[in-house]
Amino acid sequence: MLQPKRTKYRKQFKGRIKGVAKGGSDLAFGEFGLKAQEPNRVNAREIEAARRAITRYMKRAGRVWIRVFPDVPVTKKPTEVRMGKGKGSVEYWACKVKPGRMMFEIDGVSEEIAREALRLGSAKLSVKTRFVQRIAE
């Protein structure tokens, strides 16, 4: 699963996801892509599950690019522990996704295979997404 090799700080504030994606909103590598439609936190397990679903349907033909990286540590206190006594330990890593953010890109396959592969991948994610295609000039 994806996670940073090293970080400056172990824990982070929760924060809020406001606005739309400034960068990373266009197709940069592939011919087809999966674009986020709503803001949410996507964890590393979801990204990995989506990647597996996409590559499995494509039968390892073509190429997949993951355009998001889980760099936010999400903490959790153990069950049945009273409030206070500090912040909990890091439970998993997540990525804050804004609307308009390109999450996955694929290339080297036909449109119908790409559409179905990304549909299967989007089912694993906790954000509403849509299929996008590069406009031929």
Curated annotation (Swiss-Prot):
GO terms for cellular component: cytosolic large ribosomal subunit. PROSITE patterns: RIBOSOMAL_L16_1 (PS00586), RIBOSOMAL_L16_2 (PS00701). The keyword Signal does not apply. One of its GO terms (biological process) is translation. Pfam families: Ribosomal_L16. Keywords: Ribonucleoprotein, Ribosomal protein, RNA-binding, rRNA-binding, tRNA-binding. GO terms for molecular function: rRNA binding; structural constituent of ribosome; tRNA binding. Belongs to the universal ribosomal protein uL16 family. Binds 23S rRNA and is also seen to make contacts with the A and possibly P site tRNAs. Part of the 50S ribosomal subunit. HAMAP family: Ribosomal_uL16. This is Large ribosomal subunit protein uL16.
